Amino acid sequence: HPRVRRQRQMCIRDSYYRTRMTHTQAVSQIARGIAEGLKLNLYLTEAIALGHDIGHTPFGHQGERTLNDILRGKFDIIKNIKLFEKTNYFGGFKHNYQSLRVASLLEEEYTEICGMDLSFQTLEGMIKHTKLKKNEFMLEQFTNDNSANEHLHFEQVFCSTLEGQVVAIADEIAQRGHDLDDALSSGAMQFEDFQKYLTVKKMKELADIVNRVNDDIIAMNHNHRRFVDENELRNSRTVSAIVSYFINDVIRYSAVKINKYDYSEFEDNDYRVSKEIISFSETAATLNKYLETIITSKVINSPEVSLFDNNAHTIVKGLFKAYYNNPRLLHKGTQRKLYINLRNVSQNVVDFEYGNYEIIKEEFDLITGYDFNNDSTSELAKEYYEKRCVLVRIICDLSLIHI
């Protein structure tokens, strides 16, 4: 999907970086492997996996954090933002909710309906692949289906399909593999240092896996096998072996839980699961958490990543501020979207393409600058309150496409 193809996820050096597309491909592959091992619906699994990050910002999670901070009033950009926050009207920015918005509202695939016409099972898997922020978002900003709240089952934080739960854990496994690969390939962590981290008792299973990979390469050297880049091969095989370990662990542990699940309860619950069934074993969960801690200290907190995050923050914040302060900078197609969305909340809408320049300027000044501290109850205040909310979401949509 074009929304994920050029979005950098993490940057260590210019010649080595990962994008949302490579991450999505990895999640899809891992999820299919788990789903196949558990005899689940491969089509649903892949649909969720391929769509789970289409609402993500560029610059990895830093882009998401910056937009979230803007919408929650940490910067003086959106006028009267604190009044909006009291009602949780903005709530913040989360890429999983934005994925729902992209799939349900933004994409134009059909003449009859908005969005991509995905099943509720697919949409639920997309929005629940990461943590929810319940009661902080107004769902009508993200879908035009009035029954979405019922069918997305926000009463439980995990997915009501096993396929959705599979994608959530596949995302976790892929992230761990990516981060370890980045750490080793960039030189932020040497292979020997990684081996030392695994000498603690609780990491014995992973240590055995890593040592076997290293022993295999040494054995091939003794057999006069020559490698173009031995370190790169060792790193690649290590990451692959660790990812395979987690995949097999999830399949084995989850299969036991599936077999114990009361099928009559599943039938009575409209073929939805009411428990989190797809998971790591206790041992694998500990190993996963330890790996995350290592990588955070060696990579995420590194000066290179901090510089990248700082630049990302500056770009996202600067663009949002520029578009908010002067919406006429918005692309013609985006102004058309803004016009259409404003028509949904008010009949008093200016044609931004063919309207009078002074009238357009006055309208934008009111949308971005109307002071609700002086007037928060009149019909005019309510109108521009709604219009400002629309503009803010449209700018967030724009950041996903053009940065």
Name every feature range the model reports, one short phrase each.
Residues H23-A26, A312:
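Phosphate/oxyanion-binding active-site loops and adjacent basic polyanion-contact surfaces
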Residues E46-G51:
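Short alpha-helix carrying the canonical HExxH Zn2+-binding catalytic motif
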Residues Q25, Q29-R32, E36-G37, I54-N259:
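Sequence-structural signature of the catalytic-core scaffold of metal-dependent phosphohydrolases
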Residues L38-T45:
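Glycine-rich phosphate/pyrophosphate-binding loops
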Residues R13-Y17, V27:
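Sequence context of c-type cytochrome heme-c attachment sites
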Residues D215-V390, L400:
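C-terminal subdomains that position terminal phosphate/3'-OH groups for nucleotidyl transfer/ligation
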Residues H1-R8, I12, S399-H402:
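Single conserved hydrophobic/aromatic residue that forms the stacking wall/gate
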